[in-house]
C-alpha cells in the first residue's frame, strides 16, 4: 500500500541499548543480537529497534509472481524467480471471483524460450484477461466434438515449475497467501463457450492438484494429497450470492454416471447427443433444450444457463421429492437452570430471539417455532394463534414433564406455532420468558431427555433444534461429569481422556436425528466446564455447528453483543432442508473419504438435515486405474429444499488436466487446498490417536514433500550446502503447516480441553480462507498506515441515463485495509499500534512506548494506564484517525459468509522507559499479552520452534 503516512514520532533510544529487555530483532545482525523468530518473553515487551522497511516487511507487490519482490525491486530479484535472463516477470493476474484461473489456450500452443512467463509459469499470452482475443474459438456451433481429431495431451502447455530458496525469503512473503491457486490450463474446445465461468471457481470447488497424476504410482511418488474442497455456498443469504438458476425443471443427466449436463460436455452427432465429460457416455439431448415452452418458440440452445456456467442451480421437478416440502422448523431448547438465570444467559437469549423473529427465513409463511425450557424437568409451551377478538384470545400455557426416564411429549396443540399466525403470542412469550423462571434455584440440566423429547416433537417434519446451555448436563440420559484436566492435560493420553466423547449417547442420538432430517446446533456459554468434546458430536453428525463462549456473562456488554449478533446471524441464515451431497469423478477416480459436519448415509452420499452456509467439506480421492484421457472432471451436486419450499439441485463442475510427469504435478499444486487436507487429517489423528501423532504427521508429511522435491526436481545434489528449495506455488506450505502445530488445537502443553475441542471443531468445518486465518493470523500495522486506509475505496460507476448518455459517477467501495505484516515480534515496534485478526478474536496491541498524541487520537487519554484493556471497544472520538481506525476494525469484522462476530481485546505492551501502567495492571495484562503473542507464529510460541529454526531443521534432515 502506497501513500502518505501519519507522522506519529517514535521514541528515541540510545543506539547501543536494547528496548524493553527484548533485544533488537532483525536479519543479518551480529552474533550477539537476537534474531528473527527467537523466543519472545511477553513480560519483557516487544523489541524496539525498527528494521529498515519494517512498515512494509518484504511483501510482494500486488503484481509480482510467486516469490517475486515488488515492482521497484524487480531488477534486484530476478534470480529468486528462477526465470531465464531473456524472460520478464509478468503481473499476477487477478482472476475474477467467478473463475478458477481457467486458461483455455489454443491447441498446439508452444512456449517459445523468449516468451514472457505468467505468474505460475503459464505463458502470458494466454493469461485470462487476454484469452478472449487469443483463443479464436472455431468449429461446430456448440463447441468441439469428439467426431473431430482431438489435440494430444502434449499439445497444450502445463504450468511451468519455478523454485524458491525458502531460507533466502525470510520473512516469508505472506502476500502469497492471497494469490489464487495455479491456473487450470485446458485445451481449446474443452468447454462449449471458452468462458472462464465454464470451470468452477476455487471459492466453490477446488482441487489440491490442478494437474492430476495419470496413475496411482505417480501420486504416491509425489507425496502430495489428492482431494477436492467443496464450498457450495459463499454467503449466508441468497440475495448476497446470485447463482444462475435453471427454472424450467428440464434436467439432462448422464444415463450411466448420473452427472448433470454442464459447460464442459461435448455435443456430437450433429448436436443431437452430448458426451459426458465424466464417463464418456453419449446421451440424448432433451427435445426441450431448443424450445421455450412458455413462448412456444425455438430458442438458442447456447443461451441455456447450464451450458454457460459451471456453478448453477436447477429447480427440480417432483420426481426429485421423496415427500412434499416441509415447513422450516426451529425448536429452541433453553437452559433454565439457576446458573443460566444468574449469569443472564437465559434473558439474553430470549431477548435476542425476539429481536430476530423478522430475520427468520419465512418467505412462504410456513415457518414454525417451538420452545422447551430445561432444568431437572422439561417445560413445554403451547402457543395459540393470534386473535383479533380479545374475548376469543387464548393465552400461552406452560406444561411441565418431570419424568425423565420415559419422556412423554404432551399431546397438546400449538407446541410448534406458525411464526406468522402466532407472532403476537410468540413475542409475548419471549418478553416474559425470563419471568417464568426468575426464582428458579434448580441447578440441574437434563439435556439428554430434552433432546429426545424435542426429536419426538419434530421428527415427522424435520428442522433445527437449537440448544442454548450454560450448564453441564447432569440429569437423565446423557448426564456428564467433569473430567480430570489436571491429570491428563498436556500429556500423552490427553486425546483419549479429554477430547474423546464422554458418553456414546450423543453420537448415536445424532445419527438418529440425521435420519429424521433434524439438525442440532449448540450454543455453549459458561465460565465452567462444558465438555465441548462430547456435546460437539450433536452438530458434527447432523450438519450443525458448535458455538462456544467461555467465561460468558451478561455483566459484560461485549459478551452480550457477540452472543446476540451470532444468534441473530444464525437465525437469518438461509438454510436448505433435507439435503444430500454427492461428488462424482471421472473414470479411474474414486471418492475415498469425506470430511466435514454431516453423516455418510452410503459410501458416496453425505446427508444433511439442513445444509449450512458457513461450512466447507473435503473429499479425499484415490486413483484406482491408469487414466488415459487428457482431462479429468469432478462434479458436486447438492439436492435440497429451499427455506421457501422449492426443491433444487446446486451443481458445481470442475475439470483439470492429467499429467504424467512429477514436475507437472508440483507446478500446479494448490498450497491452500493442501493445507486444508492436512488439517483434516491432523484433526482425525488428534481425535483417534494423540496430539503428538497429529503434530508428527504434519511434520513428516512436509518432510516427505521436501525429500521428493529435492530428489526428483532439484538439479544436482550439493549436500549440506544445498539450499532449501521448493516450488514457488508451495513455498507457503511449510509456514502454514508449522503454524498449524502452534494453533491451540495442536500446540503442546496445557490447554483447557473445551478450548482445544472447540478449536478442532473449527478446523474441521471452516472454509479455506477462514481456516488460513486461524492458522496464520493477519496483523495490520495501524500507526503508520497509508492515508487512504480506513476510508472507502474511490471507485467509478458508469451507466446510461434516460437521455441515452453515458454517465460516470464516483462511488464508495469497501474500506481500504493496510497491507498485512508478518506474524513475528521482530516487526512490532514498541511505539506502534497493531491489529491482530486471529479469525475468532481481534487484538489491538498498543506499544508500551506509544507517544501521547497517538493515545489521545485513539483512546482519548495520553497515558496507557488509563486505557480500558481487555475485552472492550474503541471510544468514538471526534478525530479522523479514530474514525479510520474504527472503520478498519468494522471492515475486518464484516463477513457475509459467516455468523461469527469478533470481540476486540485491547492489549498494552510493557515499557521500561516510563511507569504509565501501574504494577497491578501490569500483572493483569500478563495473561492477556501471552494470549496475544501466541499468535506470532513465526516466533517461538506455542511450545514450537521459530520458523527460521524450523526450516534449518528440515534442511539438516534433508542433508543427513
From Swiss-Prot:
Name used for this protein in its record: Protein transport protein SEC24
UniProt superkingdom: Eukaryota
InterPro entries reported in the protein's UniProt record: ADF-H/Gelsolin-like_dom_sf (IPR029006), Gelsolin-like_dom (IPR007123), Gelsolin-like_dom_sf (IPR036180), Sec23/24_helical_dom (IPR006900), Sec23/24_helical_dom_sf (IPR036175), Sec23/24_trunk_dom (IPR006896), Sec23_24_beta_S (IPR012990), SEC23_SEC24_subfamily (IPR050550)
Organism: Komagataella pastoris
Subunit structure: The COPII coat is composed of at least 5 proteins: the SEC23/24 complex, the SEC13/31 complex, and the protein SAR1. Golgi apparatus membrane; Peripheral membrane protein; Cytoplasmic side.
Subcellular location: Cytoplasm; Cytoplasmic vesicle, COPII-coated vesicle membrane; Endoplasmic reticulum membrane; Golgi apparatus membrane
Protein transport in keyword set: yes
Gene that produces this protein: SEC24
Entry function: Component of the coat protein complex II (COPII) which promotes the formation of transport vesicles from the endoplasmic reticulum (ER). The coat has two main functions, the physical deformation of the endoplasmic reticulum membrane into vesicles and the selection of cargo molecules.
Low complexity biased stretches: 27-39
Keywords for the protein's UniProt record, in alphabetical order: Cytoplasm, Cytoplasmic vesicle, Endoplasmic reticulum, ER-Golgi transport, Golgi apparatus, Membrane, Metal-binding, Protein transport, Transport, Zinc
Any single biological process term in GO: intracellular protein transport
Amino acid at each position: 500500500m502506497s501513500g502518505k503516512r501519519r507522522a506519529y514520532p517514535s521514541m528515541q533510544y540510545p543506539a547501543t541499548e536494547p528496548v524493553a529487555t527484548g533485544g533488537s530483532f532483525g536479519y543479518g545482525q551480529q552474533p550477539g543480537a537476537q534474531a528473527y523468530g527467537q523466543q519472545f518473553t511477553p513480560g519483557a515487551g516487544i523489541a524496539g529497534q525498527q528494521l529498515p522497511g519494517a512498515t512494509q516487511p518484504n511483501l510482494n507487490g500486488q503484481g509480482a509472481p510467486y516469490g517475486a519482490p515488488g515492482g521497484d525491486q524487480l531488477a534486484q530479484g530476478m534470480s529468486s524467480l528462477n526465470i531465464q535472463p531473456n524472460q520478464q516477470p509478468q503481473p499476477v493476474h487477478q482472476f475474477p471471483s467467478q473463475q478458477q484461473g481457467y486458461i483455455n489456450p489454443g491447441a498446439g500452443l508452444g512456449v517459445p524460450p523468449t516468451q514472457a512467463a505468467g505468474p505460475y509459469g503459464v505463458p502470458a499470452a494466454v493469461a485470462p484477461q487476454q484469452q478472449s482475443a487469443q483463443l479464436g474459438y472455431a468449429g461446430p456451433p456448440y463447441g468441439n466434438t469428439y467426431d473431430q481429431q482431438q489435440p494430444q495431451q502434449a499439445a497444450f502447455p502445463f504450468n511451468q515449475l519455478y523454485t524458491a530458496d525458502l531460507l533466502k525469503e525470510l520473512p516469508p512473503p505472506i502476500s502469497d497467501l492471497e494469490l489464487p491457486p495455479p491456473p487450470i490450463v485446458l485445451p481449446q474446445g474443452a468447454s462449449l463457450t471458452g468462458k472462464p465461468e465454464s470451470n468452477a471457481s476455487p471459492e466453490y470447488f477446488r482441487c489440491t492438484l490442478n494437474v492430476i497424476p495419470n496413475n496411482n504410482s505417480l501420486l504416491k511418488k509425489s507425496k502430495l494429497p489428492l482431494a477436492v474442497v467443496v464450498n457450495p455456498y459463499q454467503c449466508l443469504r441468497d440475495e448476497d450470492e446470485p447463482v444462475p438458476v435453471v427454472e424450467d425443471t428440464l434436467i439432462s443427466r448422464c444415463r450411466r454416471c448420473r452427472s448433470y449436463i454442464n459447460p464442459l460436455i461435448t455435443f456430437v452427432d450433429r448436436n443431437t447427443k452430448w458426451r459426458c465429460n465424466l464417463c464418456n457416455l453419449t446421451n440424448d439431448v432433451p427435445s426441450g433444450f431448443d424450445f421455450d415452452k412458455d413462448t412456444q418458440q425455438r430458442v438458442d440452445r447456447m443461451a441455456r444457463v447450464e451450458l454457460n456456467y459451471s456453478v448453477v442451480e436447477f429447480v427440480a421437478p417432483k420426481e426429485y421429492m421423496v415427500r412434499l416440502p416441509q415447513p422450516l422448523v426451529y425448536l429452541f431448547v433453553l437452559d433454565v437452570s439457576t446458573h443460566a438465570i444468574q449469569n443472564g444467559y437465559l434473558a439474553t437469549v430470549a431477548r435476542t430471539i425476539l429481536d430476530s423473529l423478522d430475520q427468520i427465513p419465512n418467505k412462504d409463511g410456513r415457518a414454525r417455532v417451538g420452545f422447551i425450557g430445561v432444568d431437572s424437568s422439561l417445560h413445554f409451551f403451547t402457543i395459540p394463534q393470534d386473535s383479533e377478538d380479545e374475548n376469543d384470545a387464548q393465552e400461552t400455557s406452560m406444561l411441565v414433564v418431570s419424568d425423565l426416564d420415559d419422556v412423554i411429549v404432551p399431546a397438546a396443540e400449538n407446541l410448534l406455532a406458525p411464526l406468522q399466525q402466532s407472532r403476537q403470542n410468540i413475542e409475548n412469550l419471549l418478553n416474559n420468558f425470563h419471568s417464568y423462571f426468575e426464582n428458579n434455584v434448580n441447578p440441574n440440566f437434563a439435556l439428554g431427555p430434552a433432546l429426545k423429547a424435542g426429536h419426538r416433537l419434530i421428527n415427522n417434519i424435520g428442522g433445527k433444534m437449537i440448544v442454548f446451555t450454560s450448564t453441564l448436563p447432569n440429569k437423565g440420559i446423557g448426564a456428564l461429569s467433569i473430567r480430570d484436566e489436571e491429570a491428563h492435560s498436556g500429556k500423552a493420553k490427553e486425546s483419549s481422556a479429554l477430547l474423546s466423547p464422554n458418553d456414546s449417547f450423543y453420537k448415536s442420538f445424532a445419527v438418529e436425528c440425521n435420519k429424521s432430517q433434524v439438525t442440532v446446533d449448540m450454543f455453549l456459554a459458561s465460565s465452567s466446564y462444558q465438555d465441548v468434546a462430547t456435546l460437539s458430536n450433536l452438530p458434527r453428525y447432523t450438519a450443525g455447528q458448535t458455538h462456544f463462549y467461555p467465561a460468558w456473562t451478561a455483566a459484560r456488554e461485549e459478551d452480550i453483543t457477540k452472543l446476540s449478533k451470532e444468534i441473530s446471524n444464525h437465525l437469518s441464515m438461509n438454510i436448505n432442508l433435507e439435503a444430500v451431497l454427492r461428488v462424482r469423478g471421472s473414470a479411474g477416480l474414486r471418492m475415498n473419504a469425506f470430511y466435514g459436519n454431516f453423516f455418510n448415509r452410503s459410501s458416496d452420499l453425505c446427508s444433511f438435515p439442513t445444509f449450512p452456509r458457513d461450512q466447507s467439506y473435503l473429499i479425499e480421492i484415490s486413483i484406482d486405474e491408469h487414466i488415459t484421457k487428457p482431462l479429468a472432471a469432478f462434479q458436486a451436486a447438492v439436492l435440497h429444499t429451499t427455506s421457501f419450499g422449492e426443491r433444487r439441485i446446486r451443481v458445481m463442475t470442475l475439470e483439470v488436466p492429467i499429467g504424467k510427469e512429477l514436475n507437472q504435478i508440483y507446478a500446479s499444486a494448490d498450497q491452500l487446498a493442501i493445507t486444508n487436507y492436512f488439517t483434516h487429517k491432523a484433526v482425525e489423528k488428534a481425535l483417534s490417536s494423540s496430539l503428538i501423532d497429529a503434530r508428527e504427521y504434519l511434520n513428516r508429511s512436509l518432510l516427505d514433500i521436501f525429500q521428493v522435491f529435492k530428489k526428483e526436481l532439484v538439479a544436482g545434489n550439493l549436500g549440506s550446502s544445498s539450499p532449501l528449495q521448493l516450488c514457488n506455488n508451495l513455498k507457503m506450505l511449510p509456514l502454514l503447516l508449522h503454524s498449524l502445530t502452534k494453533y491451540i488445537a495442536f500446540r503442546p502443553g496445557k490447554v483447557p480441553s473445551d478450548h482445544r475441542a472447540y478449536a478442532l471443531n473449527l478446523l474441521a468445518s471452516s472454509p479455506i480462507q477462514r481456516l488460513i486465518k486461524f492458522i496464520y493470523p493477519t496483523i495490520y500495522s495501524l500507526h503508520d498506515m497509508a492515508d487512504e486506509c480506513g476510508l472507502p475505496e474511490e471507485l467509478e460507476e458508469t451507466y446510461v441515463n434516460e437521455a441515452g448518455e453515458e454517465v460516470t459517477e464516483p462511488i464508495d467501495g469497501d474500506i481500504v485495509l493496510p497491507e498485512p505484516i508478518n506474524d513475528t515480534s521482530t516487526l512490532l515496534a514498541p511505539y506502534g499500534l497493531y491489529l491482530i485478526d486471529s479469525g475468532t478474536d481481534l487484538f489491538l496491541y498498543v506499544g508500551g512506548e506509544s507517544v501521547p498524541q497517538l493515545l489521545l487520537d485513539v483512546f482519548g487519554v495520553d497515558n496507557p494506564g488509563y486505557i480500558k484493556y481487555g475485552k472492550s471497544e474503541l471510544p468514538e472520538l471526534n478525530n479522523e484517525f479514530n474514525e479510520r481506525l474504527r472503520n478498519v476494525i468494522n471492515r475486518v469484522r464484516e463477513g457475509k459468509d459467516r455468523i461469527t462476530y469478533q470481540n476486540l481485546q485491547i492489549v498494552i505492551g510493557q515499557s521500561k522507559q516510563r511507569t504509565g501502567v501501574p504494577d497491578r495492571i501490569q500483572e493483569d495484562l500478563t495473561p492477556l499479552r501471552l494470549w496475544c503473542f501466541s499468535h506470532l507464529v513465526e516466533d517461538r510460541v506455542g511450545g514450537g520452534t521459530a520458523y527460521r529454526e524450523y526450516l534449518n531443521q528440515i534442511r539438516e534432515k534433508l542433508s543427513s
